[in-house]
UniProtKB/Swiss-Prot annotation:
This is GTPase Obg. GO terms for molecular function: GTP binding; GTPase activity; magnesium ion binding. It comes from the Bacteria. The gene is obg. Keywords: Cytoplasm, GTP-binding, Hydrolase, Magnesium, Metal-binding, Nucleotide-binding. One of its GO terms (biological process) is ribosome biogenesis. Residues 1-159 form the Obg domain. Residues 160-333 form the OBG-type G domain. Its main location: cytoplasm. NCBIfam families: Obg_CgtA, PRK12296.1, PRK12297.1, PRK12299.1. An essential GTPase which binds GTP, GDP and possibly (p)ppGpp with moderate affinity, with high nucleotide exchange rates and a fairly low GTP hydrolysis rate. Plays a role in control of the cell cycle, stress response, ribosome biogenesis and in those bacteria that undergo differentiation, in morphogenesis control. GTP binds at residues 166-173, 191-195, 213-216, 283-286, 314-316. Its EC number is 3.6.5.-.
Length: 369
């Protein structure tokens, strides 16, 4: 299935049915009162997050989604039937944005999350509602309201703890296949990875994290070159980036120059993504003679000007991968605990306790260091 992470759709909720003006006419009630029923409600449209869907391809070809209108009311106090709602299933991680004003309508982050994106119109009132002590035979009725109509832009940002950065053929796909359950296409030519891949890394039965691999970046990516720039949005939700560098490239390519190009493109694309925690992973050590490894690593770090964490691995032989995975999980665990503490911290609101401000000179209060 083709990976699609953007789509534009139009959603049209159903109109409410019209109310009716009707009067009871029976054999022994020739002048019965009003009995016009209400119109049924129009169908609404909901977006539902589904973890079993991983692309927006269905919405690339089905651009319009319209719910049915509610039925009109009838006499004998018969109400019109309400139309069924429509539920559009989308991948977890989908952003739903109003295409006209850019308003973020919903961010689908959990499986089963359901969000109303177009509300159906309310049904109109029948004349039974307009009866009063001064108007015993009302002929008024109201029409159903129109359903909402919206043009939406859907953007998929995969949910992962770790994101992989690197040039084409840096070994990102080999790494993700070595440490997770993902099985991306691996070959010895550039741009083997054509769309993001997600893998679950299991440290133990109860400990795991999700890692995302995107197509490799090249110099000039922020200006449209290559494939990776269009997928960088998938790294915006990650907690940590792994910058994977090929330490033994072919054709005498300078790995320092390539690594600096990645950092440059990252900064040009998004400052927030550039500021995200980033670790340096030097790959393909199996292709470097053992007596040269230490010097090559030291020279690279010096020329690159790197001061952060550094890991030396061979994704092919899995050398160093286990230690890296352990370090990643420990880092992720600390981040998760910090987020949980933030969510649980009670927010103190002075107004809720009847205090607008505190005067240090007020004798009712004592400042404790």
């Amino acid at each position: 299935m083709k990976f699609i992470d953007e789509a534009k759709i139009e959603v049209i909720a159903g109109d409410g049915g019209n109310g009716v003006a009707s009067f009871c006419r029976e054999k022994f009630r020739p002048f019965g009162g009003p009995d016009g029923g209400d119109g049924g409600k129009g169908g609404s449209i909901y977006a539902v997050a589904d973890r079993n869907i991983n692309t927006l391809v269905d919405f690339r070809f089905a651009k319009m989604h319209k719910a049915k209108n509610g039925e009109n009311g009838r006499g004998a106090d018969c109400y019109g039937k309400g139309a069924d709602d429509i539920k559009l299933r989308m991948p977890v991680g989908t952003l739903i944005i109003d295409n006209n004003d850019g308003e973020l309508i919903a961010d689908l982050t959990e499986h089963g999350q359901e969000v109303l994106i177009a509300k159906g119109g309310e049904g109109g009132w029948g004349n039974i509602h307009f009866k009063s002590s001064t108007n015993r035979a009302p002929r008024q009725k109201s029409e159903g309201k129109e359903g909402e109509r919206r043009e939406l832009r859907l953007e998929l940002k995969v949910l992962a703890d770790i994101g992989l950065l690197g040039m084409p053929n840096a070994g990102k796909s080999t790494f993700i296949s070595a440490v997770s359950n993902a099985r991306p296409k691996i070959a010895d030519y550039p741009f083997t990875t054509l769309h993001p891949n997600l893998g679950v890394v299991r440290v133990s039965h109860e400990k795991s994290f999700v890692i995302a691999d995107i197509p490799g970046l090249i110099e000039g990516a922020s200006d449209g070159a290559g494939l990776g720039i269009q997928f960088l949005r998938h790294l915006q939700r990650t907690r940590l980036l792994l910058h994977i560098v090929d330490l033994a490239p072919f054709d005498n390519v300078d790995p320092v120059k390539e690594a600096k190009a990645i950092v440059k493109e990252l900064k040009k694309y998004d400052e927030a993504l550039f500021d995200k925690p980033r670790w340096l992973v030097l790959n393909k050590l199996d292709m470097v003679p053992e007596e040269e490894r230490k010097k090559r690593v030291k020279d690279f770090i010096k020329r690159f000007g790197w001061k952060g964490p550094v890991f030396e691995i061979s994704a092919l032989t899995r050398e160093g991968c286990s230690d890296l995975v352990t370090e990643i999980y420990e880092y992720i665990a600390v981040q998760r605990q910090a987020e949980q503490r933030t969510e649980e911290t009670p927010q103190m609101v002075e107004e809720a306790r009847g205090i607008d401000s505190i005067d240090p000179d007020d004798p009712r209060f004592k400042i404790i260091d």
